[in-house]
Amino acid sequence: MEDTQDTYSYDAPSIFNFSSFHEDHNADSWFDQVTNAENIPPDQRRLSETSVNTEQNSKVEPVQTTPSKDDVSNSATHVCDVKSQSKRSSRRMSKKHRQKLLVKMKDTHLEKETAPPEYPPCKKLKGSSSKGRHAPVIKSQSTSSHHSMTSPKPKAQLTMPSTPTVLKRRNVLVKAKNSEEQELEKMQELQKEMLENLKKNEHSMKVAITGAGQPVKTFIPVTKPVDFHFKTDDRLKRTANQPEGDGYKAVDFASELRKHPPSPVQVTKGGHTVPKPFNLSKGKRKHEEASDYVSTAEQVIAFYKRTPARYHLRSRQREMEGPSPVKMIKTKLTNPKTPLLQTKGRHRPVTCKSAAELEAEELEMINQYKFKAQELDTRILEGGPVLLKKPLVKEPTKAIGFDLEIEKRIQQREKKEEIEEETFTFHSRPCPSKMLTDVVGVPLKKLLPVTVPQSPAFALKNRVRIPAQEEKQEEMVPVIKATRMPHYGVPFKPKLVEQRQVDVCPFSFCDRDKERQLQKEKRLDELRKDEVPKFKAQPLPQFDNIRLPEKKVKMPTQQEPFDLEIEKRGASKLQRWQQQIQEELKQQKEMVVFKARPNTVVHQEPFVPKKENRSLTESLSGSIVQEGFELATAKRAKERQEFDKCLAETEAQKSLLEEEIRKRREEEEKEEISQLRQELVHKAKPIRKYRAVEVKASDVPLTVPRSPNFSDRFKC
């Protein structure tokens, strides 16, 4: 029963180092190893056991193998066969197998503790033609020569399942340093910084002593290769004593700004380029190990066997460590640098003009201004009145006759030849011979059809109605025309409706009324033709006295003289203009004539300054009696009191009004409540008394029955 049953067994380590308890971040990796060991098939386990025995006298060497196609196919089939086996064999293990497995796991634990730190493998060169994979081949010391003689090609081994390095997240364990070692390191760092500062100070002192010399070509420092430092490496957990990487230092941008030489004049220390070896092919990135193929069935079983992450206890390492240590900022010596004053090279634009410029501008303005003297008017010396020059009188506008359309029409009418009226002359015609033989103008009498006798249709029960044979009109059968078949090669394109914009046009009903009038006249003519015309002889005209109508002669339009408004306007404007000129001349003459005003100053009283009526005591002592005055604060206080009184009065009035409104509302509410109570109380109403119903007998006589006489046979 013990062999067949699947019991839970574990292998706890015999020795446990409590000092490295906080450093071991993969303490729970043992559970994953046990689950992986249980999932290994028996054939693979035997191979691993043999490899463990030969591990002591063996060396692992990376050999670049290029397996042939046959080997690859054989190995692939072998792996598939192994994985397709059932997993009951792994569950039903014997005691011997379990003991061997435990021994193997102990050995692996010891090897891991004593194993050196893993370094990343070298990158493959680009020029390497071999595409084979580096696989570690185990060679024993005793059988190495024999193996090389017998087997020219190494056999393909089964790849062991292992978690990739990315998922392991194992930190390189570094030995903890003592406090003395840490202090020594700090001392060395401080000494280095002091030496650097001394060198900088000496250099700055030399530059200050020498002063600004001739411009020298600036010395550009040689580019120094710095190793790459990825931020992803900092995400891994570090111990408290583990030093930070020296490849990359955090640089303060503000402090690095003034590191370049202040000016190209200063001489910098020259130096030869120091060649440093650098390998572009090497890198710190660890290559991910290619994971082996695992079938879905194995993945599902492993998932069910593995305990989920939510049931694992949280690591209390961070809680035990406490808060993160605060980094101390190291104080550095200040580097004295000479200020680069640029006052000499500064040029401000002068906006204010100097006195010389202002004087030059004034001279230019004076030279530009030229005085032009006008001719002397002799009338001023003569002493006569200075009159303005008369403006030139323009000729009045001459009226030009208009070409009116009425005159054109009159001329056209005169040109038309007078139409001579045709004189009526009577010509006798021969009498028709038909009038003597027959009646003329009377239509023939229409012959009515003979009446056909028919028996009377009495209303009898056995009467058989003869259906009237109605003449059936021949109905016009519509002709159906077949539409043409469409061509299948041409695609169907529907006819789009044209978007026509209807323009509103003026219309009238005159044409329609005319058409209706014509139709009406046609109908009347037809009716007249149907009527029998009566012959009425007209009397013969008298040919002795022929009276023609008098000829109406129209008188031509006679032209009359007419006055245009333009001529009147021109004459009135001239008159107004002359009047204005005369008035202006009068005003100018009056303005020129000098008229002296009367001297009123002589008759006025002279100005006498008033003396101050001060006493001698006031003038000597200097004491002056102050007049009464009123402060603005007192004035404002009075105004404030009045304002407060007005406010109090208005507030009192408001409060009175509010109380009155409140009382009214209360009274109205009381009245409404009382009315509601009265309405809610049910009061019984008395039964209404109506008049009694009196039944009266009808006075209408009874109907006398009579037989209906449907037929006319019994009538006399």
Swiss-Prot record:
The modification Phosphoserine is found at S204. Residues 35-167, 262-291 are annotated as: Disordered. Residues 49-77 have a biased composition (Polar residues). Residues 140-151 have a biased composition (Low complexity). GO terms for biological process: cell division; regulation of mitotic spindle organization. It is found in: Nucleus; Cytoplasm, Cytoskeleton, Spindle; Cytoplasm, Cytoskeleton, Spindle pole. One of its GO terms (cellular component) is spindle pole. Residues 85-103, 123-136 have a biased composition (Basic residues). Residues 104-115 have a biased composition (Basic and acidic residues). Keywords: Cell cycle, Cell division, Cytoplasm, Cytoskeleton, Microtubule, Mitosis, Nucleus, Phosphoprotein. Phosphorylated during mitosis. Hyperphosphorylated upon assembly of microtubules. Associates with microtubules. Interacts with aurka and plk1. Interacts with kif15. PANTHER family: TARGETING PROTEIN FOR XKLP2. Belongs to the TPX2 family. Spindle assembly factor. Required for normal assembly of mitotic spindles. Mediates the binding kif15 and aurka to spindle microtubules. Required for targeting kif15 to microtubule minus ends. Activates aurka by promoting its autophosphorylation and protects the phosphorylated residue against dephosphorylation. This is Targeting protein for Xklp2-A. It comes from Xenopus laevis. The gene is tpx2-a.
